[in-house]
């Protein structure tokens, strides 16, 4: 275990941030969303990941596709937000594409002079697990499938393919993305920062376990105060982190996925997607309100930490071997990726 934290410059230095983009985010799997976000033919949704604009579509053959959200004529961004359409049309010069990514029309050009294969939308590799869609910008292999298999084994018999997508919330937070990750990776702060959450979970049962490229926190829930559907055999909460920035928050009847998207060295977006099993509308609203309360408490503390890291009065801290092994494990992962290139 690392006993000392990363020094404060790791949370402020633009050069380190650029190295993270190059050596970590460009080589990692990223969570794009769920197939439930594009349930119908013609549906599309967009997202920016590692400063790259992405489209997810369900085409007329009912096939899921992932592309760069960029017109191949002059590089204009094609789509915004989400919607349903029979084609993708560039608002700059009018080139159109099929939802499969194939070039449909090239306004201003003779059809026989355009190589339609060359100018189709650029595809991105993707992988689907329990209806969750992961993408990767390069073809290097890594252990995502092994990680997901381990998670699947731990949480069985849960199957998120049976859960329904409800909503997405995006929070812009004034902190380095690692500040948010560090905060997520320990429950040490819960009694002080999250008083209501502390009554929902059984804090004495809280445990952390680390693996190669992911970690798990889990605890029992207090049945008298938990807002979740649970039984004697199903009263646990799990918090999985797939490095560098994919989070699964699992409670009985509910899945939240979070992705932490760096904006720059001192700001990040946190994207929450909510999925529910067969629970009542009342329970869904209670869960969302409760989650928003916890998130706002985390935002407050993370932004305070970012301000403190700028101080001349702090450079490097120390980890608790009992409560902060997840943070230590993550920071070791980050430093090794950067230092080894």
At which residue positions do the language-model features occur?
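Generic structural signal for secondary-structure transition and capping sites
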Residues: 25-29, 76, 189
């Amino acid at each position: 275990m690392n006993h000392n934290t990363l020094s404060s410059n790791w949370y402020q230095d633009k050069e380190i941030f650029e190295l993270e983009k190059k050596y970590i985010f460009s080589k990692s799997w990223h969570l794009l969303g769920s197939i439930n976000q594009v349930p119908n033919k013609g549906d599309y949704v967009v997202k920016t990941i590692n400063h790259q604009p992405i489209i997810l579509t369900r085409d007329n053959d009912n096939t899921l596709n992932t592309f760069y959200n960029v017109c191949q004529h002059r590089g204009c961004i094609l789509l915004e937000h989400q919607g349903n359409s029979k084609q993708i049309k560039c608002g700059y010069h009018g080139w159109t594409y099929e939802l499969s990514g194939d070039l449909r029309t090239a306004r201003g050009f003779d059809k026989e002079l355009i190589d339609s294969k060359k100018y189709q939308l650029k595809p991105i590799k993707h992988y689907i697990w329990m209806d969750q869609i992961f993408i990767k910008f390069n073809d290097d292999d890594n252990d995502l499938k092994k990680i997901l298999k381990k998670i699947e084994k731990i949480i069985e018999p849960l199957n998120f393919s049976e859960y329904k997508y409800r909503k997405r919330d995006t929070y812009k937070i004034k902190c380095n993305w690692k500040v948010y990750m560090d905060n997520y990776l320990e429950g040490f702060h819960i009694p002080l920062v999250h008083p209501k959450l502390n009554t929902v979970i059984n804090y004495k049962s809280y445990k952390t376990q680390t693996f190669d490229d992911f970690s798990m926190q889990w605890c029992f829930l207090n049945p008298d105060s938990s807002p979740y559907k649970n039984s004697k055999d199903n009263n646990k909460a799990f918090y999985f982190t797939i490095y560098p920035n994919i989070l699964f928050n699992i409670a009985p009847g509910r899945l939240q996925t979070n992705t932490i998207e760096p904006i720059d060295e001192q700001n990040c977006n946190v994207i929450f997607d909510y999925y529910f099993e067969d629970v009542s509308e009342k329970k869904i609203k209670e869960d969302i309100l409760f989650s928003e309360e916890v998130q706002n408490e985390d935002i407050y503390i993370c932004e305070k930490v970012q301000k403190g890291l700028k101080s001349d009065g702090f450079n490097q801290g120390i980890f608790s071997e009992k409560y902060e092994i997840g943070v230590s494990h993550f920071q070791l992962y980050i430093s090794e990726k950067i230092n080894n290139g």
